[in-house]
Regions:
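Helix-coil boundary and interhelical linker segments in multi-pass alpha-helical membrane proteins
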Residues: 37-40, 86-96, 140-154, 200-209
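C-terminal ends of transmembrane helices
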Residues: 53-62, 85-86, 110-123, 168-178, ...
Length: 233
């Protein structure tokens, strides 16, 4: 780990007292960064799993076979992120270099298929699963755009697109009217959530805290819209 901050002049020599103190501080900062990245990576995988579940539930209503279910689950889960990476010229595409994404998609899809054979899901299960997937992907997409040093308006756009594109592809493939084209509060929830995430950072909150705040806004808006039938117009 020393190599990560060996060039920092504040860390001094290993034998100096001040150098040792700075090394402890630097090590703590590095561990904090690694920890935050691991948490965000885990949340990204959770988002993939949730969107894969929503893809299975949508495919189930169309009576497709198991291969079709897996394809729809995968397109739903990675469609938005793939489009984001292409537009940001971010290569290789995130799921090509990390097999964990496809593993999570397949496992989530198969578990969901097995579950719905035993117990039919609640009527709003697809919408609720989609709400959590939308929140996770919108915020993770925003962070990718931030890392690419995009201006705030592009961060909002990329976050929203990452969140909604997979669901749009899912609905088109299963011959449904995409949620983004209905009167429901959908893309609006992603836009407001990502904007709130940026606003929290502007007020001095850490990125991980702002991430949580943005997620809460997206999920809350979607669940309120589902529960009370709220519309944009």
């Amino acid at each position: 780990m020393a190599a990560l901050f060996a060039d920092d002049p504040r860390c001094g020599s290993a034998s100096g007292g001040n150098g040792a103190a700075w090394r402890v501080i630097c090590a703590t900062q590095v561990l904090g960064i690694v920890g935050r990245r691991m948490i965000l990576y885990f949340l990204d995988l959770v988002g993939v799993a949730v969107f894969a579940v929503s893809g299975v539930l949508a495919a189930r209503s169309r009576g497709v076979d198991l291969l079709g279910v897996l394809v729809i689950a995968a397109i739903t889960a990675i469609g938005g992120g793939t489009l984001r990476d292409l537009l940001l010229n971010r290569y290789p595409i995130f799921w090509i270099t990390d097999a964990q994404y496809l593993t999570v998609i397949i496992a989530s899809a198969l578990l969901t298929v097995g579950y719905v054979r035993v117990r039919p899901p609640p009527g709003n299960a697809l919408l609720v699963a989609d709400a959590f997937g939308l929140a996770l992907f919108a915020l993770s997409g925003a962070q990718v755009a931030e890392a690419a040093q995009c201006p705030p308006i592009i961060v909002v756009l990329m976050g929203t697109m990452t969140g909604v594109a997979g669901g749009v592809l899912r609905d088109v493939i299963t011959a449904q009217v995409p949620l983004i084209l209905r009167r429901d509060i959908y893309a609006t929830a992603a836009i407001v959530g990502v904007a709130f995430y940026l606003l929290l950072q502007a007020f001095g909150l850490q990125r991980s805290q702002a991430f949580g705040g943005g997620m809460v806004v997206v999920v809350a808006l979607r669940l309120l819209a589902i529960r009370w039938g709220l519309h944009c117009c």
